[in-house]
Amino acid sequence: MRPLVVKLGGSTAGHEEMREWIDVLVTAGLPLVIVPGGGAFAEQVRISQRSLHFSDDAAHDMAILAMDQFGIAIAERHPRLSKAGAIEDFRRAWRAGKVPVWLPSSMARGAEDIPRSWDVTSDSLAAWLCEQIGAERLLLIKQIDPDDRDLGELVKGGVVDPMLPRMLGEKTILHIAGPSILRGLRGRFPMTGVPGQHIMRQALEGVCRL
């Protein structure tokens, strides 16, 4: 069975939704990897860049390290979660019946196929990870319910990052889940499928060619 990649948005940090989503994910009846957002850690990089005037190139590395920090925080929230920085760490976690939480810095910081820009967030890095491990499905967990099922419109609305259409593999199926999906999952364990809205790839001309 191919793994599912799940990006847990940094905006959930400090909210009850984070605990509830973790409770859902650790009961999954399929192998998955949790990709942490940057959250408040990445926001501090943005704030520091305005005062210290370091380059976007440096900010890119710092934002990925911010994902590491949030990932470490997530991994402490349940005994079934396990920090993972490499593909072999994922395999080891799955064999042990655990859910790996990706700390992306060791794999992603030097990757030449990842643009070094604020246009790349944890959304795009999660899509990139799908390609690295052969995952067919990507679930993005957001704090809002998307108003549209069209990827181009979600980019325009700022729901997903501008580089996601380009980073998303041709065969990767994208789902987005917000609060309404979480409410429907409460008390329904284990998670055996992929929750969330299936996002279509229409109207992408002029959006994915960045």
PLM features: residue spans?
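C-terminal catalytic "cap/lid" subdomain
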Residues: M1-L210
